[in-house]
């Protein structure tokens, strides 16, 4: 029977430690980490994510603010809002909730954020730092996965890691983080032939494709570690991941559940990176 990798419990533990660090920072330096979340439009799923971030920031003891903007806002107007918070010393982290309306260029908006305040880790400068082995701001989901692997003492050096999904948010940065730990990494996608056969060689399998229960037992080798990033609804409307959990757990050594695995760690890493940005602001 597999060990269930409890991301929720790890997130709670890290959040408690973060509260203590924030309290010490406030006491010693008179600085409170500040996070502003900019929300364009009224996407229901995005609203849920934003509320979760608000709660986490408040719990950590941050100064936080949510800016709600009309879906009809122009790209230039949105950039002006971002520039305002780039210049505001009270805010150390700026997050623009994605997706954005079609008339706004996501890349132009990401470029507008000060890289020092880009707590999502999507600015090309932060991406470049990651690929050059000098990461500062790292996309939060891959960062959270690395914390889970560390917590459960998963050996990466010399191991074979396979990632399903090549997004800029998870797959690509995840590959680089694993390479930094001396894993041998294969990044797969929708055009990868014989996908199950490729995945079956993995000591560590990370799945991030957004397809409910796509990965079955034929994809995993005996004793593998499986990280499920997906969050979907099955035919009965229940939350599930990209991995068929009930099938796969009988074959692997460790696996993250959905919910309660990767998800809680993503928001926790967002808070941690905001705290780290506040620390770096002391150095100018």
Swiss-Prot record:
Keyword DNA-binding set for record: no
Keywords: Amino-acid biosynthesis, Histidine biosynthesis, Hydrolase, Methionine biosynthesis, Multifunctional enzyme, NADP, One-carbon metabolism, Oxidoreductase, Purine biosynthesis
Molecular function GO terms recorded: methenyltetrahydrofolate cyclohydrolase activity; methylenetetrahydrofolate dehydrogenase (NADP+) activity
UniProt-listed Enzyme Commission number(s): 1.5.1.5, 3.5.4.9
Catalytic activity: (6R)-5,10-methylene-5,6,7,8-tetrahydrofolate + NADP(+) = (6R)-5,10-methenyltetrahydrofolate + NADPH; (6R)-5,10-methenyltetrahydrofolate + H2O = (6R)-10-formyltetrahydrofolate + H(+)
Stored CDD domains: NAD_bind_m-THF_DH_Cyclohyd
Protein's GO biological process: L-histidine biosynthetic process; methionine biosynthetic process; purine nucleotide biosynthetic process; tetrahydrofolate interconversion
Residue numbers binding NADP(+): 165-167, 190, 231
GO annotation, cellular component aspect: cytosol
Presence of keyword Transmembrane: no
Pathway involvement of the protein, from the record: One-carbon metabolism; tetrahydrofolate interconversion
Family note: Belongs to the tetrahydrofolate dehydrogenase/cyclohydrolase family.
HAMAP family found in the cross-reference section: THF_DHG_CYH (MF_01576)
NCBIfam families: PRK10792.1, PRK14179.1, PRK14186.1
Quaternary assembly: Homodimer.
PANTHER family reported in the protein's UniProt record: C-1-TETRAHYDROFOLATE SYNTHASE, CYTOPLASMIC (PTHR48099:SF5), C-1-TETRAHYDROFOLATE SYNTHASE, CYTOPLASMIC-RELATED (PTHR48099)
Stated role: Catalyzes the oxidation of 5,10-methylenetetrahydrofolate to 5,10-methenyltetrahydrofolate and then the hydrolysis of 5,10-methenyltetrahydrofolate to 10-formyltetrahydrofolate.
Name of the protein in its database record: Bifunctional protein FolD
Source species of the chain: Streptococcus thermophilus (strain ATCC BAA-250 / LMG 18311)
